[in-house]
From Swiss-Prot:
The lineage of its organism: Bacteria, Pseudomonadati, Pseudomonadota, Gammaproteobacteria, Enterobacterales. GO terms for molecular function: acyltransferase activity, transferring groups other than amino-acyl groups. This is Acetyltransferase SG1711. Gene3D superfamilies: 3.40.630.30. It comes from Sodalis glossinidius (strain morsitans). Keywords: Acyltransferase, Transferase.
Length: 142
């Protein structure tokens, strides 16, 4: 397995991966999300590759105050092999190198498997907060 920075020729493979991992939502256009990421810290967009196939991804961000991780997904046939842990670990190292003191994650409350995985990596529930959002630019429905 190789963890590397996303390349433009990974585009379709990553979107297919996200579909298989049920990461897509109708209000987020994955092509636009990738294009936006490629314009802002593209080296924090990582993929895991096995035998030439993209089998995992994570999209990281750092705003100078906190780090974040999005679009963590591993192909169902490759789960349980440490790929998600490797992606998170590599992102954490990249964030630490930038001086990032903390990473925050958003996980759906009913996603027990992912919550458990993060807890094994020493992530813990923080103060209960309500996530508010406001769409500034409407994506076309995917």
């Amino acid at each position: 397995m190789e963890i590397r920075v996303f390349r433009h020729d990974d585009f379709e493979e990553v979107i297919t991966l996200w579909e298989r991992c049920d990461l897509l939502r109708p209000w987020n256009d994955p092509e636009m999300d990738i294009e936006r990421k490629l314009n802002h810290d593209p080296d924090l967009f990582l993929v895991a590759e096995v035998a030439g196939e993209v089998v995992g991804s994570i999209m990281g961000g750092y705003d100078g105050h906190r780090g974040a991780a999005y679009y963590l997904g591993v192909h169902p046939d490759y789960r349980g092999r440490g790929i998600a842990n490797a992606l998170i670990s590599r992102l954490e190292k990249k964030l630490i190198a930038r001086g990032c003191p903390k990473i925050n994650l958003m996980v759906r409350g009913d996603n027990d498997a992912v919550i458990s995985m993060y807890e094994k990596l020493e992530y813990e529930m923080q103060d209960s907060v309500l996530l508010l959002g406001k769409r500034l630019i409407e994506d076309q429905e995917y």
